[in-house]
Amino acid sequence: PHPPIFIAASRSHETLEFLLDNDFNICIAVVQDTRDALSLIDRYREGCAERSRTDNMGEIPFFRYVHVAPTDRLAEENVKNHVEWIQDVMQWRRHLTQTTEVNRDIDDWRKIRNELPPTYEYIKANRGFIGTPEAVINQIMELKSHGIKYLGCNFSLAGLSQEKVLASMRLFDEKVRPFI
């Protein structure tokens, strides 16, 4: 016996089939757009039904970047640079195909890269719940309408101060959680 195993499935049909065939659970990470992730969840549920297995939706984590602030402007001021840095690093790491060691300064790499990562605005619209309590509540309720029951919140965004992380978490607890 072993504890449940979760696999952060990608768009790959093979990965989804592997986890379904081996009775593993899916995990949705922040690297997928919400729309694509919901489509993947639909395919996961269909695959579970075809195999007569429970989909365990109450235990399937669906992760999003989350930052709650009193105003949208403050939320953006707090996290924009951090979200963009995360995207830079994720793109940078994909280029390290021959090694796991970083032997180049990220600023040097930024000067020679041939594509830009997703912007803050794109991440906010497609992978993040960033804004006022009301805006975040609306986004969470939209997920719930698709059967998502377990939201994983990435509050700590790449160098965001502990003070700002805790302020966001407190605001989430006080103004968002009671409504979801």
Describe each model-derived feature in a short phrase.
Residues P1-N22, R35-D42:
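Internal, glycine-rich beta/alpha segment that forms the wall or movable "lid"
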Residues D36-G47, L160-I180:
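C-terminal helical cap(s) of enzyme catalytic domains, especially alpha/beta-barrels
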Residues R35-H146:
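An alpha-helical appendage that flanks or caps ligand/catalytic pockets
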Residues F18-C27, G147:
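Glycine-enriched alpha-helix->loop->beta-strand junction motifs that scaffold or abut catalytic
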Residues R11, Q32, V66-V68, L157-G159:
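Active-site-proximal loop/turn and secondary-structure-junction residues that shape catalytic pockets
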Residues I5-A8, F24-A29, G58-Y65, L151-C153:
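Hydrophobic faces of well-ordered beta-strands that scaffold small-molecule active sites
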Residues T132-S156, L160-D173:
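Long, low-complexity C-terminal extensions of enzymes
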Residues I5, L19, Y44, A75, ...:
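Conserved, mostly hydrophobic/aromatic
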